[in-house]
Amino acid sequence: MAEELNLERCDLEIQANGRDHHTADLCQQKLVLRRGQRFRLTLYFEGRGYEASVDRLTFGAVTGPDPSEEAGTKARFSLSDDVEEGSWSASVLDQQDNVLSLQLCTPANAPVGQYRLSLETSTGYQGSSFMLGHFILLFNAWCPADDVYLDSEAERREYVLTQQGFIYQGSVKFIKSVPWNFGQFEDGILDACLMLLDVNPKFLKDRSRDCSRRSSPIYVGRVVSGMVNCNDDQGVLLGRWDNNYGDGISPMAWIGSVDILRRWKEHGCQQVKYGQCWVFAAVACTVLRCLGIPTRVVTNYNSAHDQNSNLLIEYFRNEYGELESNKSEMIWNFHCWVESWMTRPDLQPGYEGWQAIDPTPQEKSEGTYCCGPVSVRAIKEGDLSTKYDASFVFAEVNADVVDWIRQSDGSVLKSINNSLVVGQKISTKSVGRDDREDITYTYKYPEGSPEEREVFTRANHLNKLAEKEETGVAMRIRVGDGMSLGNDFDVFAHIGNDTSESRECRLLLCARTVSYNGVLGPECGTEDINLTLDPYSENSIPLRILYEKYSGCLTESNLIKVRGLLVEPAANSYLLAERDLYLENPEIKIRILGEPKQNRKLVAEVSLKNPLSDSLYDCVFTVEGAGLTKEQKSVEVSDPVPAGDAVKVRVDLFPTDIGLHKLVVNFQCDKLKSVKGYRNIIIGPA
């Protein structure tokens, strides 16, 4: 009778498997695999080698605290002639004496998470059990049988593997790209993502069921949506929008997700202060990409927050056009969420592909502050019954805006306002390029098209179906040159009278600082004039906006809202026009000193010229970049920076990975907040 088979050690082939599974950056000390794909391991036996005729090898793989075969969290499988795609299986690749090379495969629908892999050997009546090791299983966009399969290699690289990108801010007429370090493969981030799953309320309520449901990207996406904010749980970020961030970090100051997730994990899942929509979206993007779900950050300009699902945002104003009060139903200058790519077997065919997921805490969904995933195609078709939260997202891109003027006798009169259209310039980063891609067409049919009317009919969007009132008089706000922070500049109310009659009017122009979520600040410019509109004429009325007026009240959004109200007393009519202005920050210049080589020190020289007429104090540069810095670095400048002078610092980098990387920079001082810059750096082999 053959002696018992004894395992000496197991080599999980971490580096080789990491290369094959596109997880090399995660496979420093642990095995990270993508489901539905073969992987290798090597068994070293002592005494004698494996003999197929007398030895039986049985493998076990378990995940979660209470694994079971019924829940899909426990599997037992034996050696077979070849691995079976789509199931737990193992086969022999090669044997050299006491060394056995094996190939294993996981199902394409296995729950993601940490697994324990074991081996049982049996020879006749003898048997032993061995612990082979642990591995982490992720979703697999390269596997056709996986629910997150994406058939474009360029898109897989962009939406799963790329660790840097851009988030779009500013205003619809001045879109600003902000660099961001997602850093999903940086040290400790995968552990933070797995911890996020393990402290979510659904896991704490029913651990076995939660682990089982982690097979579905729909479920995982919804969990991540709820856990990135901390409104119901031990989530990552605390939101704040009142411009008081003294006991934390301003949302505008962040330049990446890595520092946020590390802080959350290292402080025992305590909320990180503070986030706003793009920070919530960026952190969700990092987590979902890390777990293997193709994801991108999306920005919607003129985004509606409709609380009562009537697809209508109503503003009540006094006779001067001023809002009676700030309210919760508002139009945000822009709003960010993420889209993740997946199939939707729970929905009708055609609703697979990009799914909107919004982690910013706005409204509760099934009792939790989360939103989505909802099919972007369902939004485009106006199918508001679709899971999850279709009506809320539809309103974000389609709600109508009605302005009411409350007159002196208390009655209200509807004002014409053709300047504000909800859901414009929906933007995301292009695949493989540092450019913006407009994806509005994926959410909406062309304005005025028959398809658009069909969608509004299906969604019972009655206000959008009503005919727009035309008076023959039109007004829009135009801008001049030089809209940079620190400058005085002009804006213009451009008024056209396309009728044969003369019009006696009063024009009230007002400029106020504004936060990106629509909350107004103090006035920084006004004009009140009477004018006559001659028949078939055009008029351009200027409003001068001075730096000394806006400098003390501009928020970190760098936004000013200009409103024009044209009143025609004889006709008792009001015409409203608005425009949001983004004031450009000064440019951050980045020079790379030395030859960029792997595992060799590199120096970045970072500078900024003071554009203001005053000195800058308390200047701080903060830099980070996946593959360039192990952690975020900050450099303080003790001396004041006089007007017109440049402030310059040097930062040491240590590139660990070859290829293209982004160095992301933030600059703060007493008068300039959250100035961003970046530099692409190509790292060559040592």
UniProtKB/Swiss-Prot annotation:
Keyword terms: Acetylation, Acyltransferase, Calcium, Cell membrane, Chromosome, Cytoplasm, Disulfide bond, Extracellular matrix, GTP-binding, Hydrolase, Isopeptide bond, Membrane, Metal-binding, Mitochondrion, Nucleotide-binding, Nucleus, Phosphoprotein, Protease, S-nitrosylation, Secreted, Transferase
Catalytic activity as recorded in UniProt: L-glutaminyl-[protein] + L-lysyl-[protein] = [protein]-L-lysyl-N(6)-5-L-glutamyl-[protein] + NH4(+); L-glutaminyl-[protein] + serotonin = 5-serotonyl-L-glutamyl-[protein] + NH4(+); L-glutaminyl-[protein] + dopamine = 5-dopaminyl-L-glutamyl-[protein] + NH4(+); L-glutaminyl-[protein] + histamine = 5-histaminyl-L-glutamyl-[protein] + NH4(+)
Subcellular compartments: Cytoplasm, Cytosol; Nucleus; Chromosome; Secreted, Extracellular space, Extracellular matrix
Predominant subcellular localization, coarse grouping: cytoplasm
Any GO CC annotation of this UniProt entry: nucleus
UniProt entry tagged with the keyword Amino-acid biosynthesis: no
Site note Important for catalytic activity, residues: Y516
Family: Belongs to the transglutaminase superfamily. Transglutaminase family.
Modified residues (N-acetylalanine): A2
One GO biological process term: positive regulation of sprouting angiogenesis
Disulphide bond pairs: C230-C370, C370-C371
Binding site for GTP: R476, I477, R478, V479, G480, D481, G482, M483, R579, D580, L581, Y582
Cofactor(s) it depends on: Ca(2+)
Name under which the protein is recorded: Protein-glutamine gamma-glutamyltransferase 2
UniProt crosslink position (Isoglutamyl lysine isopeptide (Gln-Lys) (interchain with K-?)): Q632
Binding site for Ca(2+): N398, D400, E437, E447, E452, E538
E.C. designation(s): 2.3.2.13, 3.4.-.-, 3.5.1.44, 2.3.1.-
PROSITE patterns (UniProt xref): TRANSGLUTAMINASES
Regulation: Acyltransferase activity is regulated by the binding of GTP and Ca(2+): inactivated by GTP, which stabilizes its closed structure, thereby obstructing the accessibility of substrates to the active sites. In contrast, Ca(2+) acts as a cofactor by inducing conformational change to the active open form. In absence of Ca(2+), Mg(2+) may bind Ca(2+)-binding sites, promoting GTP-binding and subsequent inhibition of the acyltransferase activity. Extracellularly reduced and activated by CLIC3.
Key word Membrane present: yes
SUPFAM superfamilies according to UniProt: Cysteine proteinases (SSF54001), E set domains (SSF81296), Transglutaminase, two C-terminal domains (SSF49309)
Induction record: By retinoic acid. Up-regulated during pregnancy.
Modified how: Disulfide bond formation inactivates the calcium-dependent acyltransferase activity. Cys-370 can form disulfide bonds with both Cys-230 and Cys-371: formation of a disulfide bond between Cys-230 and Cys-370 facilitates formation of the disulfide between Cy-370 and Cys-371, which promotes inactivation of the acyltransferase activity. May also form interchain disulfids between Cys-230 and Cys-370. Ca(2+) protects against disulfide bond formation and inactivation.
